[in-house]
């Protein structure tokens, strides 16, 4: 059988790394600082969503007028907080099972990119902390779209722009940890690998019908998957 090259699209938070609640807290701090109103962001406020949509939703709940200037000031402050505080925090950690899976995918000759709700600058800070940023030639980020369902299509387009390589949706694999990740893969006709880090989310993800669903990525058989 001839080798079939796939494009694996990796999510960051909850998949490759755990931010340890640090980035969520810093984003809330940035919104609070620039609006003057105290904001708390819980797990369900951020998991599976883009940075921009998280902030928009928070501002809507506060009845704040959303302007491009306000969003820019919030994110610029957020970036500065991430640079100064995330990089030195001991709370974030890497999920070794996913890094091992990334190794397996790349060693098998497949292509990889990022598919994340993070702003590009934030994604870079998070991954450089664990020396993972250089593993990816490109990604699709929150600046590109606030609609996660659109991200696989943008990744396909970017693969051509960067590598001059074409992948059909059936030869793309979304790797994530949330219902939104599963939906983005399945509704675009991609294969979907979901690692469930929150046991209470299992049933909701399982209903989506991903190709693989488990609590630890060590058990994935790459040959069976692709």
Please provide the spans of the model-predicted regions.
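Active-site neighborhood of HAD-like aspartate-dependent phosphohydrolases
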Residues: 2-47, 53, 60-61
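Short amphipathic alpha-helix with an adjacent loop that forms part of the alpha/beta core around
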Residues: 220-226
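Short, acidic loop-to-helix structural element flanking the phosphoryl-transfer center
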Residues: 4, 9, 84-114
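Acidic, Mg2+-coordinating phosphoryl-transfer loop and its flanking beta/alpha structural elements
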Residues: 174-214
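Short acidic-hydrophobic, aromatic-tinged amphipathic segments that line or gate anion-handling sites
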Residues: 140, 211-219
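Substrate-recognition element of Asp-dependent hydrolases with the DxDx(T/V) motif
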Residues: 98-128, 140-146
């Amino acid at each position: 059988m001839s080798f079939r090259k796939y494009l694996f699209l990796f999510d960051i938070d909850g998949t490759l790394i755990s931010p340890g609640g640090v980035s969520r807290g810093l984003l809330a701090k940035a919104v609070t600082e620039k609006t003057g109103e105290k904001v708390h962001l819980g797990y369900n406020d951020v998991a599976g969503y883009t940075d921009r949509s998280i902030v928009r939703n928070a501002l809507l709940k506060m009845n704040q007028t959303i302007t491009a200037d306000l969003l820019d000031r919030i994110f610029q402050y957020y970036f500065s907080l991430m640079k100064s505080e995330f990089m030195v925090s001991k709370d974030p950690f890497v999920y070794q099972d996913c890094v091992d899976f990334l190794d397996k995918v790349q060693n098998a000759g497949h292509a990889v990119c990022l598919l994340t709700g993070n702003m590009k600058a934030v994604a870079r800070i998070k991954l450089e902390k664990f020396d993972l940023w250089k593993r990816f030639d490109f990604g699709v980020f929150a600046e590109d779209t606030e609609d996660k369902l659109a991200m696989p299509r943008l990744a396909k387009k970017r693969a051509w722009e960067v590598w001059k390589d074409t992948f059909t949706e059936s030869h793309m694999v979304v790797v994530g940890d949330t219902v939104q990740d599963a939906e983005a893969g399945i509704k675009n006709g991609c294969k979907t690998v979901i690692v469930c880090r929150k046991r209470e989310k299992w049933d909701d993800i399982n209903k989506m019908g991903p190709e693989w669903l488990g609590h630890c990525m060590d058990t994935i058989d790459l040959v069976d998957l692709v």
